[in-house]
Amino acid sequence: MVMLADALVKRMIEVGALKFGDFVLSSGKRSRVYVDVKLASTFPDILEMISEGMAAKLKDLEFDRIACVELGGVPIAVALSLKMKKPLVIFRKEKKDYGIKGDRIGEVKEGEKVVVVEDVITTGSSALSAARRVEESGASVAAIIAVVDREESGRNFMSLLKLSDLIEAHDSIQPTES
């Protein structure tokens, strides 16, 4: 698993998924570092590493379905669904008022155990919102897992990488000024 995490960090840095500047995160917080997992997940090899890493972390967990919130979690949840042969549900950020008018694509059945997938966790509010929606459907949350945990939530979420891992790796491959 360590080799996979190292390879994932390296590739995310290579494709420019670790950005430095002044950013406003979805939580509203400001940050000097932005982890663009959405960009990273457009590369098939990275998406495969993510799904392999998550599948390895979840292999001993009993669950029935994978859930995510649009947009960032979708490619990750789809890849994990294919890898683990589990159905998935995608929660919309907002209920649509046209077509089927639903707040989700797919279903959650009463009594199911569901894994919630996220791209990046900052405060955890998006993941916890998805978890609430799972529970409101009569199912239970088996786990919440993210590609990157920014380590700002005060909670111990399951993740493949911590923000500090990415920054440390980035700093170790940057030339130092004399």
From Swiss-Prot:
PROSITE patterns: PUR_PYR_PR_TRANSFER (PS00103). GO terms for biological process: 'de novo' UMP biosynthetic process; pyrimidine nucleobase biosynthetic process. It is an enzyme of class 2 (transferase). It catalyses: orotidine 5'-phosphate + diphosphate = orotate + 5-phospho-alpha-D-ribose 1-diphosphate. SUPFAM superfamilies: PRTase-like. The keyword Magnesium applies. Orotate binds at T122, R150. Its EC number is 2.4.2.10. Keywords: Glycosyltransferase, Magnesium, Pyrimidine biosynthesis, Transferase. NCBIfam families: pyrE (TIGR00336). Homodimer. Belongs to the purine/pyrimidine phosphoribosyltransferase family. PyrE subfamily. Catalyzes the transfer of a ribosyl phosphate group from 5-phosphoribose 1-diphosphate to orotate, leading to the formation of orotidine monophosphate (OMP). This is Orotate phosphoribosyltransferase. It comes from Archaeoglobus fulgidus (strain ATCC 49558 / DSM 4304 / JCM 9628 / NBRC 100126 / VC-16). The gene is pyrE.
